């Protein structure tokens, strides 16, 4: 493995062609990079959005990936396949470019029980485990999926849970998110966002939030105590009793990075590369004259646009550009029902909302859609 990686990121190789991959590819393109996507699925969701798509299983043909590493500036895993992640960790020393990933942090964050132990070890406030009285909040023990997450109001229902499900107190409040990128010594806490969730606890919209010193301090502590060399997403509930961290995910997120980009001007792909090439600086101030609305809407059979989350989006078969003008970008995910990802930005919320209205009118004129 080379000791010096060079100063610029011109070509990035993404391992994974689903929603995480789309987010990373989008921001890479915004930074002027060429995007190569590798996925073992020939019908990978973003195969046509990438500049180049190669279909093969890296665990079966590692020599291909080693050869590719000589012609790209970085490799970024954008999937949650544990076999794939562990395999990349085992062969990363053979690559001629860095892997922009903290494997040890991912091991902790992927396992929600290990995460809770980590939170307790550094005094991070978090929902109580196995409370004596309902309501309870139950969620899967691994990965970042919201599948199976729900509120239980009757103790009897606990007996019907799938084995291994985590049981926590239900905490009222809004779901908030913060990305942190570290180089192992310095940790850049980026931009707070509000995660709008549906009845299945899946995110259908992201909007920016004002600076929150306590959330930034918590997120910094979580990154510094690992210590993080890579990217990590911190999610918390912000309620009447303050912040309670519900999970960390040490992998490149989907949805929030685009909202962060347009509301702060910070490209998380560029910042992540700097963590492996020369180091990063902590972020002290952010611009206040930016706002962004990021959301997913499905065109139902009755012509109505319905908010949906990533669970629906992930069932699509092709994802790419649909419409663009200053302050408006619309992406189309083809499938049983078309799902649009709409991104609107401006100097403030009012300008972003005006552009949202224009974007919705575009869909209405083309599809007869009603929001």
UniProtKB/Swiss-Prot annotation:
What does UniProt give as GO cellular component?
cytosol
**Binding positions (L-lysine):** 19-20, 80, 254, 310
Which residues are ADP-binding?
112, 139, 146, 168-171, 247
- Describe the reaction catalysed, as an equation: (3R)-3-methyl-D-ornithine + L-lysine + ATP = (3R)-3-methyl-D-ornithyl-N(6)-L-lysine + ADP + phosphate + H(+)
Name the pathway it acts in. Amino-acid biosynthesis; L-pyrrolysine biosynthesis
Amino acids binding Mg(2+) 1: 235, 247
Q: Where are the transmembrane segments?
A: none
Going by the record, the broad EC class of this enzyme is ligase
Domain named ATP-grasp: residues:
93-277
Is Metal-binding given among the entry's keywords? yes
Protein function = Is required for the biosynthesis of pyrrolysine. Catalyzes the ATP-dependent ligation between (3R)-3-methyl-D-ornithine and L-lysine, leading to (3R)-3-methyl-D-ornithyl-N6-L-lysine. Is also involved in the synthesis of pyrroline-carboxy-lysine (Pcl), a demethylated form of pyrrolysine that is generated by the pyrrolysine biosynthetic enzymes when the growth media is supplemented with D-ornithine.
Q: Which family does it belong to?
A: Belongs to the PylC family.
Question: NCBIfam families in the record, alphabetically?
Answer: pyrrolys_PylC
The entry's protein name is 3-methyl-D-ornithine--L-lysine ligase
- Species of provenance: Methanosarcina mazei (strain ATCC BAA-159 / DSM 3647 / Goe1 / Go1 / JCM 11833 / OCM 88)
Q: Report the gene name.
A: pylC
């Amino acid at each position: 493995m080379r000791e010096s990686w060079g100063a610029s990121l011109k070509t990035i190789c993404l391992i994974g062609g689903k929603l995480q991959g789309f987010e990373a590819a989008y921001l890479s393109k915004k930074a002027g990079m060429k995007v190569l996507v590798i996925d073992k699925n020939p019908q990978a969701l973003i195969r046509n959005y990438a500049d180049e798509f190669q279909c093969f299983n890296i665990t079966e043909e590692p020599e291909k990936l080693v050869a590719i590493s000589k012609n790209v500036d970085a490799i970024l895993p954008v999937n949650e396949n544990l076999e794939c992640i562990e395999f990349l960790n085992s062969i990363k020393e053979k690559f001629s470019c860095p892997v922009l990933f903290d494997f040890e942090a991912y091991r902790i964050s992927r396992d929600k029980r290990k995460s809770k132990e980590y939170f307790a070890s550094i005094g991070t406030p978090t929902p109580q485990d196995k409370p004596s009285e309902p309501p309870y909040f139950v969620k899967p023990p691994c990965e970042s999926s919201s599948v199976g997450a729900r509120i239980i109001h009757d103790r009897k229902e606990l007996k019907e849970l799938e084995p291994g499900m985590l049981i926590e107190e239900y905490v009222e409040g809004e779901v908030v998110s913060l990305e942190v990128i570290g180089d192992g010594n310095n940790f850049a806490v980026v931009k707070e966002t509000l995660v709008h969730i549906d009845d299945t606890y899946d995110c259908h919209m992201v909007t920016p939030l004002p600076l929150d010193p306590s959330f930034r301090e918590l997120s910094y502590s979580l990154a510094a105590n690992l210590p993080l060399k890579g990217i990590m997403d911190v999610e918390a509930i912000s309620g009447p009793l303050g912040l309670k961290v519900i999970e960390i995910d040490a992998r490149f997120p989907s949805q929030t990075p685009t909202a962060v980009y347009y509301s702060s001007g910070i490209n998380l792909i560029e910042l992540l590369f700097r963590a492996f090439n020369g180091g990063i600086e902590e972020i002290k101030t952010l611009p206040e004259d930016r706002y962004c609305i990021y959301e997913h809407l499905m065109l139902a059979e009755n012509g109505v646009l319905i908010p949906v989350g990533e669970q629906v989006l992930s069932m699509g078969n092709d994802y790419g550009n649909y419409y663009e003008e200053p302050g408006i970008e619309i992406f189309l995910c083809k499938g049983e029902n078309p799902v649009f990802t709409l991104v609107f930005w401006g100097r403030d919320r009012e300008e972003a909302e005006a552009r949202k209205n224009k974007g919705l009118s575009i869909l209405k004129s083309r599809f007869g859609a009603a929001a």
